[in-house]
Amino acid sequence: MKLHIFNPEHDLALAANQSNYTAPHAGRQLHKDLAFIPALWADENDFVLVDDIDDAYDKVRHLGAIYNKVEFITPLQLSEVFKNTMLIDSIHPWGWDLALVSQLKRLGCPEIMLPTADLLAQLREVSGRRWAAEHLQQDVEFVTDEESLRCAIERRGKAVVKAPWSSSGRGVKYVASPSAFSESNDGKLVAPNLEDTIRWAVKVMKQQGGVTVEPFYNKVKDFGMEFEMKDGKVNYRGLSLFETIKGAYTGNLLATEKEKETVLRNYFNIEHLRNMREVMVEKIEPVLKNLYSGPFGIDMMIYADEEGELLVNPCVELNLRRTMGHVALDLGLSEKSSLHLMRVEYDGNRYHLRVMPGKPSEDAPMH
């Protein structure tokens, strides 16, 4: 029997790298409101950790009785399970980090079921943008001092500066050198004040050891590929067509693989997808073979070059954890009709996972 945990604050916990990390309010709220979602992929009778069992069952019923098959369990109950039984044989969080391991230890989880400190450190390293820059990406550099940062920005004219670890929509700055024009991309303003970005980056360097400097792409559409590492092999699970607002995730298209490929076919020759996938697997599989087991994803991007030709960046981000793209794939398997939208919405008080028929509008395209 498996224990599933939704810890969406994982990316921020990696950045903090502290045993007693407390996420910002928004992260804690998202954790609380969507704690039930592992029920979408858990096996029958698996445990799913939540704070409020009645609330979790109520939410899962709204997604269909097919998901009403798991055992929701509170932290207090989990502590008793660890203390008195051997019911749980493996733990499957959204992502592994020091804060989660410390929490599980406090609940009495046997250490043999948890990653070691050395393994956690390795997972954190591979999860960081520096590792991706050095192993998976092209034309991305990692700088560790202010002078190198200024030179990198001036050399590019316009650039994207990122913290090594951060959640979606955070830890990312769009910047232009004094010699470049200030303009916007996808609603994100290129920082008119270079010095603001420099000060921010210097602070990040002190906390996380450096920042990445990447090309400023004229983005046309986001998409991704979802994988699972199992028994030392990378298995491809499917495409993810997702939507972001100012870099923060808002939703996914639920559709068959053929339908998703049809969407992408409007932008580039999708025969190249297989080659991109094979190249990424060839690079990642040897590294993860003895390090990681579970889901992960790679965010990609369609962009236009200066001549207007559409190209593909095959690795914008490596997410060494479960992703909302995986959730969309699991939900999509159960949908009787295609072209549904899965959205994470905030009503000012709580977060909601909604699934609705339809397709992206022209005003709000689903990337």
Can you say where each PLM-predicted feature lies in the sequence?
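Peripheral (often C-terminal) accessory segments that flank ATP-dependent C-N-forming ligase machineries
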Residues: S337-H367
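N-terminal-proximal low-complexity accessory segments that begin disordered
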Residues: M1-L40, E44-D46
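A long amphipathic alpha-helix within ATP-dependent nucleotide-binding catalytic cores
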Residues: K206-G210, Y236, Y249-L310, L353-P365
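Glycine-rich phosphate-binding loop of ATP-grasp-fold ATP-dependent ligases
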Residues: V140, A159-T197, G224, K246-L264
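ATP-grasp fold ATP-binding core
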Residues: I153-A176, A201-K219, I298, E317
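Conserved N-proximal alpha/beta basic substrate-recognition cap immediately N-terminal to
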Residues: R28-W41, L49-E154, S167
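ATP-dependent carboxylate/phosphate-activation module, predominantly the ATP-grasp catalytic core
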Residues: F227-E282, N319-R343
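Phosphate-binding site of ATP-dependent enzymes
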Residues: A191-T250, I302-D305, E309-C315
